[in-house]
Swiss-Prot record:
One of its GO terms (cellular component) is cytoplasm. Keywords: Leucine-rich repeat, Repeat. It comes from the Eukaryota. LRR repeats lie at residues 32-53, 54-75, 76-97, 98-119. The keyword DNA damage does not apply. One of its GO terms (molecular function) is dynein heavy chain binding. Residues 138-178 form the LRRCT domain. This is Leucine-rich repeat-containing protein 61. Pfam families: LRR_8. InterPro entries: Leu-rich_rpt (IPR001611), LRR_dom_sf (IPR032675). The keyword Glycoprotein does not apply.
Amino acid sequence: MDPPAEKPGEAGGLQITPQLLKSRTGEFSLESILLLKLRGLGLADLGCLGECLGLEWLDLSGNALTHLGPLASLRQLAVLNVSNNRLTGLEPLATCENLQSLNAAGNLLATPGQLQCLAGLPCLEYLRLRDPLARLSNPLCANPSYWAAVRELLPGLKVIDGERVIGRGSEFYQLCRDLDSSLRPSSSPGPRATEAQPWVEPGYWESWPSRSSSILEEACRQFQDTLQECWDLDRQASDSLAQAEQVLSSAGPTSSFVF
């Protein structure tokens, strides 16, 4: 499946702003954002996203992005999903030195050479260029030998398109690929096999943020709630003191005492 065609009036698209980021995360500072999900918002411009220097997990899938320029400053980014956009290159990711997982299925990447910018990323182990379940792909995936080209270009990858290529289980996936190749339609006449349908909904196998990131996010939210309660108590105490002072001042000095 190719990326969605541009709709009338969508050329400008939406731009990421500080207000948008703060409203979706509840954070006071952009540098404090660790996890960000901006899926399917019609975004065409990443705007100030490059200021989120602490960002570790980012989902930009299902938008209208044509470039990733601001992501070049995100050195802590570990998981990135830019599937189903209009990207023709990934060059800004060359400086994302902590990137471990990249989903770029459903874009306009035409040749394996456009992945050369990823060759210097020491932590990159998971790469997806094609997602049969979501019916997303890239033009380069039309070449049956693209797998071999990607493996040669990025030898550190452990998983390509959801299939393990290094380590335990890689032999099983290789066997499946060999069987798949042998079952591809030939030029000989005969009934055409029924196309396999997805077993699960798109996004079922999507990776989610690590437990540590989720715990940290929850802790931050609890801290914000506690801080808000402190502000409320301080305001109530100030109101009580003001009322007490008003009562004392209106009573005046006491002239006599009764025992």
